[in-house]
Swiss-Prot record:
This is Pre-rRNA-processing protein ESF2. Belongs to the ESF2/ABP1 family. Transmembrane segments: none annotated. The gene is ESF2. GO terms for biological process: endonucleolytic cleavage in 5'-ETS of tricistronic rRNA transcript (SSU-rRNA, 5.8S rRNA, LSU-rRNA); endonucleolytic cleavage in ITS1 to separate SSU-rRNA from 5.8S rRNA and LSU-rRNA from tricistronic rRNA transcript (SSU-rRNA, 5.8S rRNA, LSU-rRNA); endonucleolytic cleavage to generate mature 5'-end of SSU-rRNA from (SSU-rRNA, 5.8S rRNA, LSU-rRNA); small-subunit processome assembly. Involved in the small subunit (SSU) processome assembly and function, and in the 18S rRNA synthesis. Required for the early cleavages at sites A0, A1 and A2. It comes from the Eukaryota.
Length: 326
């Protein structure tokens, strides 16, 4: 008979312990799983709490900043206004004293600037020199304003063209305005009776300046003078035209009268040669006298009657008419 090596009762206990061990392991595993979930939930809740804490900190910081700004504003409001006034007065003291505001309001005309220009007179302009060339020659000595050159008369121009001359414009004399009179005086003093110069083979190299400074004369004076001369010329022309018309009319009337008198005298002479003392000559002479002398007008006047004159009776007029018929 085989002997037992182990106790059955002990084996049963060990098996129970083993089963219990397995059960404990499973229970431990089951306990481990929810703990992990709890840890995740705990981590999530902690993150949310941290975010909320950060938001609360930010809100608290904003509130503190707003309070600080309000405190700063209150502090600036507390600064007395006298300091600002003192600062403004200090700035005003630094400004120049002669500074003025330029206001152009309606009803207040602005005073015009003083005219400091000067005018020179050129008694002779080189032949066929244009105003642009003259300006280019005088500009180096100062700022040039207006230029006026007198053209040659139309009659002399037509005569020159008929003689085979060039069609370019020819100017006789002129006036030049400088914006500053000191430049005009300098030009008149230093360039008068001097050669124009420039390139040696230039067209105007040997021409001579003839310049005179017009003291106390401005450009508007020249314009007024030219306008007055044009008005006087037009008035003289109108007077001459009216005088010529009246002279022509009187001449034609005298010419017609002379022809008529010559015709009458010729007819009278013919009749005298024929020995006919016709009455037609007297009639012709009367006609001539009527044409030469103005007719005399005579007016017939009615007789004066008194208010007390008696009116004729009704039957007297009829009797007078019947007596004249019988």
């Amino acid at each position: 008979m085989a002997t037992r090596k182990r106790n059955e009762w002990l084996d049963a206990a060990e098996s129970d312990d083993d089963e219990r061990g397995y059960d404990s392991e499973e229970e431990s595993r089951a306990r481990m799983l929810p703990s992990a979930k709890r840890q995740k939930r705990d981590h999530d809740s902690e993150d949310e709490e941290d975010a909320e804490d950060q938001e609360e900190d930010v809100d608290q910081d904003d509130k503190e900043d707003d309070e600080d700004d309000e405190d700063d504003e209150d502090a600036t409001d507390d600064i007395p206004k006298t300091a600002e006034l003192a600062h403004l007065e200090k700035l005003a003291a630094g400004l120049p004293s002669n500074l003025k505001l330029q206001t152009t309001k309606l009803g207040k005309p602005v005073a015009p600037k003083k005219d400091k220009s000067g005018v020179i007179y050129l008694s002779r302009v080189p032949p066929f020199m244009k105003p642009t060339v003259l300006r280019s020659l005088l500009t180096p000595y100062g700022a040039v304003g207006k230029i006026f050159l007198t053209p040659e008369p139309a009659a002399s121009r037509t005569q020159r063209l008929r003689g085979g001359g060039t069609r370019r414009k020819l100017f006789l004399d002129g006036w030049v305005e400088f914006l500053h009179k000191r430049d005009a005086k300098f030009v008149a003093d230093n360039l008068n009776a001097q050669t124009m110069g420039g390139k040696k083979r230039g067209r105007w190299h040997d021409e001579v300046w003839n310049i005179k400074y017009l003291s106390g004369i401005k450009w508007n004076h020249l314009v007024e003078t030219i306008q007055n001369e044009n008005a006087e010329r037009a008035a003289r022309m109108r007077v001459e035209i009216s005088r010529g018309k009246s002279e022509n009319k009187a001449f034609l009337e005298n010419l017609e009268m002379g022809k008529m008198i010559q015709g009458i005298e010729a007819k009278k002479k013919e009749k005298e040669d024929r020995g006919d003392d016709g009455e037609g000559m007297k009639a012709a002479e009367q006609v001539v006298e009527k044409k030469v002398k103005k007719p005399r007008r005579e007016f017939v006047q009615h007789g004066v009657t008194s208010k007390g004159a008696k009116k004729p009776e009704p039957g007297q007029d009829v009797n007078r008419v019947l007596s004249s018929m019988m």
